[in-house]
Structure formats: C-alpha cells, structure tokens
Amino acid sequence: MITHSLFRVLILSSLVSVCPALLAQAPAAASAKAAAPASDPVAEAAFDAFFKLRDQPGAVPSAERFDQLIKSGVPLLAQYPKNRRTGTVIGKLGDVAQGINDRKLLPLRDVWFSQLNFAIINARQSATDDDGKAAVMALAAANANAQARLIGDKDSLEAAREKIDALAAQPGGDRFIADQEMNFVEVIKGRSPAMAEKLVTQLKDHKNKTLASRATDELRIMEVRKTPFDLKFTSVDGKPFDAAALRGKKAVFLHYWSVDNEASVKEFDVLKEKYFEQRERVEIVSVNLDPAEKRPAVDKVIKDKKVKWPQLVDGSGMKAEVAARINIRSVPNGAMLDRAGMLAVPRARAWQIDTELKKMGFKF
C-alpha cells in the first residue's frame, strides 16, 4: 500500500520519476464479477445517445461541447454503475483532452479538465450508493491519469496515485480498479519504463484477479520488447522466413487469423492492397491460429486469396507460440515490428499499417 506522504517523498527525491515502491492499494473487498443486471431499455438508449455524441464525426472541441458530453455521460455513472458499458463511458470521458491535438486548441484541455472535475464533485455528492460512488471515483481517477499523462509533473502524478488509491478503498471500486491501475502504468511508462515494470511486477500479485491477469500480460509484453522479436519458420510454400534478415530495412506486420473468423479472413483483402502499396516498407506475415485438423480449410483460404506473403501454419491453434508470446488470444488481431525488429505495436489491424509506418519514420 502506498501512503500519500511516502509517495510524495519518493516522487520528489527521484525528480518526478516514479519510485520503485509504487505499490497499489488493495481493494476494499476481494474481486468478484457481479452478475450484470437485466438490460434496461431506458439505460441503453441513454448510453447510445452518449456514444453517438462522443464519437460525432468532425466535432470541434469547445466549452459548449464539453458541457454536452458531461451532461450526457457523467450522470450515467451514478445511475447505472453496473451497466456493461459504464467502464467504456469512463474511458471515453477520460481521453477527451488527449484527443485535442491542434496547437491552437490546446488551452481547451485545461477547460475540459476543469469542467469535468467540477462535474465529478457534484456527481459524487449525488450518488446514492457505493456502486455509484465507485463509478464516479473511477472517472476521477481516469481524469487524473489523463492529466498526469499530458502534464507529467510531480503534482499530477501524485494526484493520479491518490485518486486510484481512493478508488481501491471504496466499496465497489474493484469493478474499475484494473482499468485505472493499468492506465497509471501507461503514464509511468512514459516517464520511466523501468519504474513501470517494477509497478507491474507488483500488480501481477494483486488480489483483484482481473488486474493481476492484465499485469501479467503487460509484463510479458515488456519482456518481449527488450530484444528483437525472433521469428523464423518455413512458409507453406516451402520458402524460409527469418525476420532478422529484414532488420534495418523493413517493418513487419503480423496478421493473426482463423478460418472460423470471417473478419480475419476478410483482412487478407486489405492486406493485399497494403502488400503492393507498402512492400518496400513492410513485410506481411500471416499467422494461422487453427488446429491441425482444419489444415485443408486453411490451405483453401490461402489458395483462394492468392496470398503472396509468408504464411506460418503449424497447427497449434490458439496456443501457437508466436501468438502466446504477445498475449494474442482472439482474431482478428495483429502486431507490428519496427525496422529494428522490436515489437512496436502489440495490437494492430491492417488499416493501421500506414499510420504506424509513419510513426516509425518511414517516408511516403
């Protein structure tokens, strides 16, 4: 458990780096998945209205829009804290400021934080039960995490830690603690990857099983990212493939798919376009996650799609090592290696290839 005073001392002594002793506070009660209540048409309509407003194409940030988002989203937390989409509302509200990237509009980030903080205070006072209070406190933690991510000074980091610890101590907070602890890990990672790894190492033993599982997955990714991603196999056409041969030349996109998942099969069509458009910048490798008995169907898809790039098919199914190594448990899915062979994007889809290549510094 981290105390406020200990956290402050360690933050100051490490010049705003996160300290190794950054332990998460245990939740007030053991984690348990509460049964979701029956669907409420009124609630679902309210959630739909919020998501439509939040994801409105071309919406321009402004104080008026912020007010609309807050009035549409914040009351849902206290009213429907156990709704399956409450966590998503918290996430959508929590990342509003991060989506403001136009330099001329950057001052609006502070406007958003101010308006949301005021709304959180009012919502917490109006919450009538522990679950509602926990949901509002989760939003407070999400907002503090967002400020810490964008500001990164000792006060914002300390404030985020305090909000998360308060959420952990709140009855009902265990429903939301995993998201906020892992968000805090991302904040710390931007300041000190080594400190983030120490924090995740501690979180993997947390009594909240969801949090412990996510921390374990994150640790696996952190470990993979320490060295170039090793990938060497013989493709279905008999040709050898070794990712090491591409280092310094191309990025690599890993496409995970299964014959039973239509979306992952359709992604071959998008990848064919990328293969011809970006073949000088990226190598595509498809990794099949079907069991051995489905090999005939797998071969048929590869033949019908007229795939030109390497195909890894070993019949291991979802237990394939190249998938398990980076926590791939479902399809469609993907990942990207940069030109140095390092895991750059643990989760990626075909339509993201161009954007990620630009982030890696490839010229178009």
What are these regions (language model features)?
Residues 25-75, 79-84:
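N-terminal leader/linker segments that initiate helical-solenoid repeat arrays
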Residues 305-307, 314-359:
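Thiol/disulfide oxidoreductase modules built on the thioredoxin-like
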